[in-house]
Amino acid sequence: MNENPAYKSGFATLIGRPNVGKSTLMNRLIGQKIAITSNKPQTTRNRIQTVLTLDEGQIVFLDTPGIHKAKNKLGDYMVNVAEHTLNDVDVILWLVEPTNFIGAGERHIIEQLKKTRTPVILVINKTDTVKKDDILAFIDTYRKELDFQEIVPVSALKGDNTDVLIQCILKYLPYGPAFYDEDTITDQPMRQIVAELIREKALRLLSEEIPHGIAVTVENMKERGRICDIEATIICERDSHKGIIIGKGGQMLKKIGSQARPEIEDMLEMKVNLQLWVKVKKDWRDSDILLKNFGYNPKDIEMGE
């Protein structure tokens, strides 16, 4: 496949305000669940690299955290990762919601995009939530703000028009051999994917004040015949949060585990024995050492990784 002189390969990044559907779109394009999704903003914390290999080319997607106003060191890290990525890729996909209103969050992104020479494709997501006739008006609103190479309306949830988007991305990639083997779908370590799946379930089940104050670490992951034993810890910032995560008689923790386990089993293609614990690390989102321990390393940005 790679000997084909017409073969293309390159990097695309998905940016946008928190909760516009970046992870849902990437999962749809790849055809497998890699990035966690929830109805709460700032679900994605690291750049997640996933790979789509086609007959005509290979697209390596970087799903970045949403660009937002940072409230702590973790927030700073997330914003820096997103903005640093813009100059490292061959094409940028900017995801927006179908609306005529351009808020402060979008204005901030527009300013960032004006600073880069990387081609930008505007992706208007969630088209399944509006009338088709209204989409043209949304396109006109955004077209006045920036010179986009392409504008593609899609529904990440339903998969509408995503095939057109893939062809648009390929158009802006350079010719060259694939970066990854054709059976590769992500460069994330398996432990990190398991931790993210557990965090996704916690995000969905827990009340508003807790989710962004949690991290998940996988302490142990061992195969025992046809079973994989996994020990993981949910880290929170307050003693009061610990009680909520565990729940009455351990019911909430059990619920998080029972929802995460089937998806982990599907991914590993084997039975999973999942043990969950909860630990308190006060104000971990403002501690450089703890951020590094939980996999958020600002030096990754400087190194361009």
Model-based region annotation:
Residues 53-58, 80-151, 222-227:
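Conserved C-terminal guanine-recognition region of P-loop GTPase G domains, centered on the G4
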Residues 1-87:
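Conserved G1/Walker A P-loop phosphate-binding module
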Residues 32, 51-55, 70, 85, ...:
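Conserved, well-folded catalytic cores of nucleic-acid-processing
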